[in-house]
């Protein structure tokens, strides 16, 4: 039951991510210069938030630690966003970001993406997708919202005016029931985070 709910949210979030990815790719094809400017501003914002250039890191161990910490923080943020059932919106931004990174690579790094690049991007995106979908599935059961656009839209229309919507009456039972699934999910996410940091540092 928990797996089914998580997969349903993962599929919904994936559609938002893929849609934004494809639309952004089309816009890059139409307006490459404007989209490159947008990517440059996004990169500046990420650096202001704490991301560092490779040149700023003294050793590969420093690079591994930095990538792991930044990605772990991002994954936690996406999990928290999923708890308030805003993951489809967030995954749209993920699709936009990775489309900019992928399709503007010839301008940004001087070459098109190779197999390793696509594997890295796919692994990073899947980690965020899984984190947001797992928490959304838990929150969906907690607040009585299924992974359908009609129910999500109905929830969004009524939730903006409330800091935290009221959960269903048996929320304690739901929380206990989700504890094993959330624990397993945390282990899987930790493994993915370590793999991504290792691959980006040592795998190229």
Positions of PLM-derived features:
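Cytosolic juxtamembrane amphipathic/interface segments immediately preceding
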Residues: 1-10, 161-175
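N-terminal signal-anchor transmembrane alpha helix
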Residues: 3-39
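Membrane-interface interhelical connector segments
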Residues: 34-58, 104-117
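Juxtamembrane inter-helical linkers in multi-pass membrane proteins
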Residues: 42-53, 145-171
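Interfacial helix-start motif at the membrane-water boundary
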Residues: 51-79
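Conserved mixed alpha/beta catalytic, RNA-binding, or beta-rich assembly cores of soluble enzyme
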Residues: 86-116
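Alpha-helical transmembrane segments of helical membrane proteins, especially in multi-pass transport
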Residues: 120-148
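Juxtamembrane boundary at the C-terminal end of a transmembrane helix
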Residues: 191-204
């Amino acid at each position: 039951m928990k797996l089914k709910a998580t997969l349903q949210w993962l599929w919904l979030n994936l559609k938002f991510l893929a849609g934004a990815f494809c639309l952004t790719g089309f816009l890059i094809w139409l307006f490459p210069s404007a989209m490159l400017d947008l990517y440059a501003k996004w990169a500046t914002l990420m650096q202001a938030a704490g991301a560092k250039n490779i040149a700023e890191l003294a050793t590969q161990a420093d690079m591994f630690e930095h990538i792991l910490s930044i990605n772990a923080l991002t994954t936690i943020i996406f999990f928290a966003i999923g708890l308030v059932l805003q993951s489809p919106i967030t995954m749209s931004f993920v699709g936009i970001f990775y489309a900019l990174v992928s399709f503007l690579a010839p301008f940004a790094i001087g070459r098109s993406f190779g197999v390793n690049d696509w594997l890295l991007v796919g692994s990073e995106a899947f980690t965020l997708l899984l984190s947001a979908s797992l928490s959304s599935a838990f929150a969906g059961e907690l607040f009585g919202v299924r992974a359908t656009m009609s129910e999500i839209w109905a929830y969004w229309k009524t939730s903006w005016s409330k800091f935290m919507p009221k959960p269903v009456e048996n929320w304690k039972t739901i929380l206990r029931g989700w504890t094993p699934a959330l624990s397993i999910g945390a282990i899987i996410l930790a493994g993915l985070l370590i793999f991504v940091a290792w691959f980006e540092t040592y795998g190229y």
